[in-house]
Design a protein with these regions (language model features):
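Small-residue-rich hydrophobic transmembrane alpha-helices
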Residues: 49-113, 146-168
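Short runs within selected transmembrane alpha-helices of multi-pass transporters and secretion channels
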Residues: 65-68, 139-158, 164-179, 192-208
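Hydrophobic alpha-helical segments typical of transmembrane helices
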Residues: 10, 22, 34-35, 46, ...
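Hydrophobic faces of transmembrane alpha-helices in multi-pass small-molecule transporters and flippases
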Residues: 3-34, 39, 59, 63, ...
Length: 232
């Protein structure tokens, strides 16, 4: 009976963790919509290339997202067990795995992006295939930046500092909006190709010092109830 009783403190703590995580995806999506809208003004060829490239990019991004999700669980467990020093070990190990995966993905997309694009684009559409390949070549070159973003963001979320993780999504949104409003009208499709990578860089510029701040706090806290992080 006691376990089924409503616990206001626990509910507030769960909401403090869950709501920022949900808002983060909404905030990031706003920037992506802005970038797509800017690309739509460049013509049908750019729209088709962007659509095909995004499908392929999202497929190859899945392992990076999975690494991040694994780090959220790993860091949360070790934080709860009073072993925060292992969080840094996990970040280093997952970063190594990420770089190994990037080498493989870089080789595949730099050599076979046009071939893969033919799953979505007719072989006769040379311009669209070229634009799709250009987008993928730029994106995969910055996958280490994206991988670090996923690892650090989910690690920070895993130990309860969800508001800081959400702010990295705000950084991404700002970067994509700036690219959409300033760079795309001036430089065209090539600016669209660099839109995501610019957002990833902006997010990492926030996440790296944020993780350093969080990790230093973790080392000073022996137990997770020593100072509740959910409000940060």
């Amino acid at each position: 009976p006691g376990e089924r009783r409503f616990n206001g403190r626990l509910a507030r703590q769960l909401l403090g963790i869950g709501v920022p995580m949900g808002l983060q995806f909404s905030i990031t999506a706003i920037g992506s919509i802005m970038l797509q809208s800017a690309n739509n003004a460049l013509g049908t060829a750019c729209v088709a290339a962007f659509t095909a490239a995004m499908r392929i990019k999202m497929f190859f991004m899945c392992p990076l997202e999975s690494l991040g999700i694994a780090m959220a669980t790993y860091s949360g467990q070790n934080y709860g067990a009073g072993r925060p020093e292992r969080v840094w070990q996990g970040v280093r190990a997952s970063s190594l795995l990420m770089m190994v995966y990037w080498v493989f993905t870089f080789a595949v997309l730099m050599t076979a992006s046009r071939t893969i694009a033919r799953l979505f684009v007719d072989a006769s559409e040379t311009e669209i295939l070229n634009d799709t390949a250009l987008f993928l070549h730029v994106s995969v070159s910055f996958f280490p930046v994206l991988g670090l973003l996923c690892i650090l963001r989910y690690t920070i979320q895993g130990v309860g500092y969800t508001n800081l993780a959400m702010l990295s999504g705000v950084s991404e949104m700002i970067a994509r909006i700036l690219v959409s409003l300033l760079a795309v009208p001036a430089f065209g499709y090539i600016a669209v190709c660099f839109g995501d990578s610019t957002a990833w860089i902006f997010a990492d510029l926030f996440l790296i010092p944020a993780f350093a701040f969080v990790y230093r706090r973790l080392l000073r806290m022996k137990r997770p109830d020593a100072a509740g992080p959910a409000g940060l």
